[in-house]
Structures are given as C-alpha cells and as structure tokens.
C-alpha cells in the first residue's frame, strides 16, 4: 500500500537521502504511469503548489516530467517528495492519491503518534524502528485499522481483514477476512429444551 505521509522523528536526513535515490528510479512512461484524469492532475499539482507557497520544501519535483517510452499521452506526474510539511497545510489533511509523499517532522514518538491520530483518516500506519517498545506503542496507540512494523502496510489477502478507522472505515465490518463473511451471513437463533415434563405440561 502506498504511503501519503511520512512522520519523521529525530534525525531523518539520511532516510530522506535514501528516499530520493529510490524515488528517482520511478520514470514516468517507463515504470510509472499517468494519473487517471486531467482533474486528478490539476488537483495533485494544486496540493504541491499550495504546500510550496506555504513554506514546505520541494525536494523532488514531479511536475512537468520528461516522459519516456511509447505511452506519452496522459497526465503524467513524476515522484514528488515534500519536506517540512505542517499540519495546517491541505496536503497534510487530505488524501492526495498521487505519486507524492509529504514529510512532517516530529520531536519525539509521542508527538508523531499525536500527528497520526489527528488525521481524520485511519486506514493504515507503519512504524520503522529497531525498538520493540516503540513499535508496541504505535501498535497500541495509533488510530488506524492496519499497522505495519518495519514494513509498508501490506494490503492483506482474502483471509485477513482489510479496513480502516475513522473516515477511512467502510462500515461495521472489514471488506475481507472473517468479518466480511459475517456481513453476508444471515444468522438464525434457535433455543430448545427437552425434558420429561414436556409430555404433561399445558402445551403438550
């Protein structure tokens, strides 16, 4: 599952450097397709422009990319990484649905969890750490329906539940796994009692 936002705790510049290296391997028209429509393109670039004007730093700009390969028609955006995003920016509060990742910086783990929980959406969250205690805190406190530890949240296969919390919730059940079977199951409750008195009571 793609992540829309990274909340970095402490010194994360070395992680961002690696992200830039990997993101540049995504080539529009070669191994990165276009967004679905002109409206989507304008919406996504609008998020980027607003964040830039509000003081965020564009580390990798995917606007107006050079498109390689034969499939050049389409609304292409290259991978985009935006640092120093703040919670008052629209890009931090809404779903982008594009090749864009926003980086929000937090002073410590408590602040990072507060940032995650302040978001109205709660589909999934992931934590990357070598501390079992920190991982446990995120698993227990993050307001999300799916949690990944040292792995980007995998979209589960049918036997596992898939669903979020808050504004990402589908309803009373997840769309896969046991609860999806329960959703489509029509329950019937039957209560029985058998004893010798049944032969002589007033309803026999």
Would you name each region that the model predicts?
Residues 36, 59-62, 127:
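Short beta-strand segments
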Residues 8-9, 24-28, 69-204:
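Conserved C-terminal structural/oligomerization subdomain of aldehyde/semialdehyde dehydrogenase
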């Amino acid at each position: 599952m793609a992540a829309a936002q990274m909340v970095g705790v402490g010194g994360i510049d070395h992680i961002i450097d690696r992200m830039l290296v990997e993101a540049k391997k995504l080539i529009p028209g070669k191994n990165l397709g276009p967004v679905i429509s002109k409206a989507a393109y304008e919406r996504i670039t609008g998020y980027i422009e607003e964040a830039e004007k509000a003081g965020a730093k564009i580390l990798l700009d995917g606007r107006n990319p050079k498109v390689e390969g034969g499939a050049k028609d389409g609304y292409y955006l290259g991978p985009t990484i935006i640092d120093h995003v703040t919670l008052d920016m629209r890009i931090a509060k809404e779903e982008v649905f594009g090749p864009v990742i926003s980086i929000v910086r937090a002073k410590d783990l408590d602040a990072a969890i507060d940032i995650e929980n302040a978001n109205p959406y709660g589909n999934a969250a992931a934590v990357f750490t070598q501390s079992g205690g920190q991982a446990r805190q995120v698993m227990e406190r993050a307001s999300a329906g799916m949690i990944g530890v040292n792995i980007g949240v995998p979209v589960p296969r049918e036997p596992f539940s898939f669903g979020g919390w808050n504004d990402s919730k589908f309803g009373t059940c997840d769309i896969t796994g046991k609860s999806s079977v329960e959703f489509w199951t029509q329950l019937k409750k039957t209560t029985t009692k058998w004893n010798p008195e049944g032969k002589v009571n007033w309803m026999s």
